[in-house]
C-alpha cells in the first residue's frame, strides 16, 4: 500500500489518497471520526481545536460502506479556512527556531515564510490519523491492535501533575514536550525481514515515527538502556509450550529481533520536542532586513503530546497493515484473512 496527503493548515481542506487496500474492508466512518476527535484532545491544546470539528468525507473507493479495491480518497474540511478566505495576510519574515521556517524558505525560494509553515504545520497529521484509522480497521480484521500511552510531559511522569506544569509553561510563554509509548499487540512472528536493510520492521517503524512533526527520538524495547547492560540481562530467553508455541518471559527486544517481529508485543517509545512556536518568542533574524528580531508568533499549543500519541498510533498501524498485506497478500479482505489464518496454523505447527 501507499498513501499521500495534500493540503495546507489554513487551506480549504486536507486530502489523503490510499492505494492498495483490499476490497470489502468495512470503512467505519464513526470510528475514523472518533480517532480524529482523539487527536484534537489532550491538555495544553490551542484555540484552533475549538474551531475545528474534524470529520472524514469519503470521496472515492467505497461502495455500500466497503472498499472496492480502487484508491480510497478522503477529505477533512478545515473550518478555520472561512476565517482566512479572501483575507490579505502580511508576509511572514521572522522564522521560528525549531520550525521548518528558515530552511524551507531558503530551499523553496520563498520570501513569505507562511508558504512553508502552512504545509509543515502539524495540522497535516489530521489526514494521517484518518489514514491510520483505515489501517486500524484492516488490522482489527486480523486481531492486531495498536494503542499508546503518554509516559512524560515536560519531564514529569505523574499524570496528575501535567495540568499544573502545562499552565506554568503557558504563563511563562513557553512550551513542553514529552515521551510516548506505542504498544502493538497481536503481531505474529514473521513481519519484516533480515535479508535487506530496507525491509527491517524496526527500521520501517522508526522511519514513520520520525516522520511525525516534532518527534526527535525513537527506541524499541529497552532501547538505549540495552547499551548499559550485559547481554545476559538484555536478550529474551526462548521457551516452548505445546499450546502457546514459542514464547518469551521478557520483552526487552520490544517484539522485534533481526528486523523481524518475534510474536511479542511491539513496544516503541518516541520523544517529542517542545512545540517551536513560543508565546515569548526566541531571537531570530528577519530574512529581508537581516536584522535581529524576535521570532514570529502563530496561534499554537502549549503542548500536544497526548495528540501526538494518537498520530503515532496511526503511522505505526499503517506500517503493520502494509507489512501484513506484503506478507499475506489478498485482493479482498476475505482472501487476506484466509491467507493469514493459514499462516498462523503454519506457525503453530512449526
Curated annotation (Swiss-Prot):
One of its GO terms (molecular function) is FMN binding. InterPro entries: Chorismate_synth, Chorismate_synth_AroC_sf, Chorismate_synthase_CS. Its EC number is 4.2.3.5. Keywords: Amino-acid biosynthesis, Aromatic amino acid biosynthesis, FAD, Flavoprotein, FMN, Lyase, NADP. NADP(+) binds at residues 39, 45. The keyword Flavoprotein applies. Pathway: Metabolic intermediate biosynthesis; chorismate biosynthesis; chorismate from D-erythrose 4-phosphate and phosphoenolpyruvate: step 7/7. SUPFAM superfamilies: Chorismate synthase, AroC (SSF103263). The keyword NADP applies. Gene3D superfamilies: Chorismate synthase AroC (3.60.150.10). FMN binds at residues 119-121, 213-214, 258, 273-277, 299. This reaction introduces a second double bond into the aromatic ring system. PANTHER family: CHORISMATE SYNTHASE. This is Chorismate synthase. It comes from Thermoanaerobacter sp. (strain X514). The gene is aroC.
Amino acid at each position: 500500500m501507499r498513501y499521500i496527503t495534500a493540503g495546507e493548515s489554513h487551506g480549504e481542506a486536507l486530502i489523503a489518497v490510499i492505494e492498495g487496500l483490499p476490497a470489502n474492508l468495512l470503512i467505519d466512518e464513526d470510528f475514523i471520526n472518533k480517532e480524529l476527535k482523539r487527536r484534537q484532545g489532550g491538555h495544553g491544546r490551542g484555540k484552533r481545536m475549538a474551531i475545528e470539528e474534524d470529520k472524514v468525507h469519503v470521496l472515492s473507493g467505497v461502495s455500500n460502506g466497503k472498499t472496492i479495491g480502487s484508491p480510497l480518497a478522503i477529505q477533512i474540511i478545515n473550518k478555520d479556512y472561512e476565517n482566512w478566505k479572501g483575507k490579505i495576510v502580511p508576509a511572514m519574515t521572522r522564522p521560528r527556531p525549531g520550525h521548518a521556517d528558515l530552511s524551507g524558505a531558503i530551499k523553496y525560494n520563498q520570501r513569505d515564510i507562511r508558504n512553508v509553515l502552512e504545509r509543515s504545520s502539524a495540522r497535516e497529521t489530521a489526514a494521517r490519523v484518518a489514514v491510520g484509522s483505515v489501517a486500524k480497521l484492516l488490522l482489527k480484521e486480523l486481531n492486531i491492535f495498536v494503542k499508546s500511552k503518554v509516559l512524560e510531559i515536560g519531564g514529569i511522569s505523574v499524570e496528575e501533575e501535567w495540568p499544573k506544569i502545562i499552565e506554568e509553561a503557558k504563563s511563562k510563554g513557553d512550551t513542553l514536550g514529552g515521551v510516548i509509548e506505542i504498544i502493538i499487540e497481536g503481531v505474529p512472528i514473521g513481519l519484516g525481514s533480515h535479508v535487506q536493510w530496507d525491509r527491517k520492521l524496526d527500521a520501517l517503524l522508526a522511519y514513520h515515527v520520525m516522520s511525525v512533526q516534532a518527534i526527535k527520538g525513537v527506541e524499541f524495547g529497552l532501547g538505549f538502556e540495552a547499551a548499559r547492560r550485559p547481554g545476559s540481562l538484555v536478550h529474551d530467553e526462548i521457551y516452548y509450550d505445546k499450546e502457546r508455541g514459542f514464547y518469551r518471559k521478557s520483552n526487552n527486544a520490544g517484539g522485534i529481533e533481526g528486523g523481524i517481529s518475534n510474536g511479542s508485543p511491539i513496544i516503541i517509545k518516541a520523544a517529542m520536542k517542545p512545540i517551536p512556536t513560543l508565546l515569548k518568542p526566541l531571537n531570530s533574524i528577519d530574512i529581508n532586513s537581516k536584522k535581529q528580531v524576535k521570532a514570529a508568533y502563530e496561534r499554537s499549543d502549549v503542548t500536544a503530546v497526548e495528540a501526538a500519541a494518537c498520530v503515532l498510533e496511526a503511522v505505526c498501524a499503517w506500517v503493520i497493515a502494509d507489512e501484513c498485506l506484503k506478507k499475506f497478500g489478498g485482493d479482498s479482505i476475505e482472501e487476506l484473512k484466509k491467507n493469514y489464518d493459514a499462516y498462523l496454523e503454519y506457525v503453530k505447527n512449526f
